[in-house]
Amino acid sequence: MTTLVVLTVVCAASPAATERQITFTPKNHHLDNNDNFSPDGRFLCYDTRETLGPGIENSQSIEKVEIVTGVEALLYTPGSSVTGTEAAPGVGAVSYCAQGDTVAFIHGPPLDQVNDRGYYAKPNRNGMEVVADGSGKHVWLDRRDTVATRETIPGAHRGGTHRHEYTLDGRRIGFTYDDVLLPQYGRTIGYMEPHPNAPEGATHYVTLLVPVVPERTAQPGEIEYAAGDSWVGREGLMRAFIGKVRAEDGESYEESLFVVDVPRDVDITTAYPGSATRLPSPPEGVRIRRLTHAHAEGIVRGTPEGDRIAYYAIAADGTRQVFIIASDGATPPIQATHFPHGVDSGLRWHPSGNTLFCISHNGVAATCVKPGERFGETVFLTPQGDTPERFALA
């Protein structure tokens, strides 16, 4: 079973902090690299995948735990479900909203829709929002419309949304997306926002942000796949992502860091909703910028102020390290970490923008990224190494 461990940092300059297990119930507690802390820092939200079977499709509940007491609370569970290799609905990948006591997460097809929609799958899921007070009060964020004989309902999507991430001001929600009507198109990204013209049954109007081309058909510079996305800044005016793009030789591919500019006043209703033969396209005024031509990977992370983006890349010594680049692309990327064993995962900014956190060699580390003499200085906040107990906490 997966348990949650909280790290208490007594002093950022100390070589180690205190780890404390906070969950003990006999089920999995999965964070999924999302925005799991409540706005007041009291709770962590999680799903329970892998308890009854593999994957989100077998997760039966969305829950939270109070960090100080370890008390767990159920936030949402489907009324009925089926588990196994063909499962539904499946709920998971939960994130808190920074501006209210709500969480958003993936919700697969309700059982009464399985005959029409099929079982849980990547292109067969919606976003749901639940009030995190234990009342179970919930709304559907988006509407799914897969009718192939007409254009898609404006503001709806035709597949599955995933990894729902609120902006820090709570106004927009970003997501990754898989299309069911045109499966020859790879994963891409989009966003949604509350709108009076949201389709019936949903609170938000949906649009894609990156118009990918069908797999294995890209011309040099065209994007076939977009993922690893996160907001840059508080207001959702930029969304950074990793794009798989055809190289200039017309044969090979590159994975590079991109940014989508989403103006504050963009009219989301100018987006094309798509049809059985055309993928949806972004609203007017959205612009895509390529920031790197060297390899980039992972889930990228932007500062709250929106001035810098952190991502993973391969250093000169062949290890995976954290690099930083200005969000406007005005300066070249800078290598921020120099871990002998490279970086594993868990990349996050401190709210100040002066420190990055990540996992290396099964330990949690903090790296100073404030410009100046201390840039790149790193301290491990936990023990590290290859011992069984470290693997258990990784």
Annotated model-derived regions:
Residues 15-394:
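Sequence signature of WD/YWTD-type beta-propeller architectures
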